Amino acid sequence: MEPWYKVTTPRAEVRGGRSFNPDEFAIALEQVVAGKAPLDYRDAKQFFDRTVFTRALTEHLGMVLRRLAGQTQNTSSVLSLITQFGGGKTHTLTALYHLVEHSKTSASHPDVQKLLKDCGLSQPPKSKPAVFVGNAWDPAEGKETP
């Protein structure tokens, strides 16, 4: 196996020795939806530029996109994303949010184009996402969404 430094180049922040803010690496989906997240997560193009389309991510996104397109074979109406901390659950949900909420921008990204082609789709299906983050609301105040 090749050493990591021969396979990939660390991001500029790492190469420059910049100290890290852990908040930059933990996506808060409610902040993405509210337009308050860091630009790398809020902007669909930048988000997908930084996303590695792993097999698990590709399978989950493909299943949901096919289901939204009305396909029921080899899809599920409910997905259970069970992973450890940092396993990609919120990243998957954020990717889905961008795919349906910012479909034109998302569909122009080369990795998304490949995903759509593999799903037999030319663009993300039209849908209206609803986002509820259970630990980001006050049960006494409630939450209204348009």
Provide a role label for each language-model segment.
Residues T51-V52, L79-Q84, T92-P146:
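P-loop NTPase motor core
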Residues M1-G87, T94, L99-V100, D138, ...:
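Walker A/P-loop-proximal flanking segment of P-loop NTPase domains
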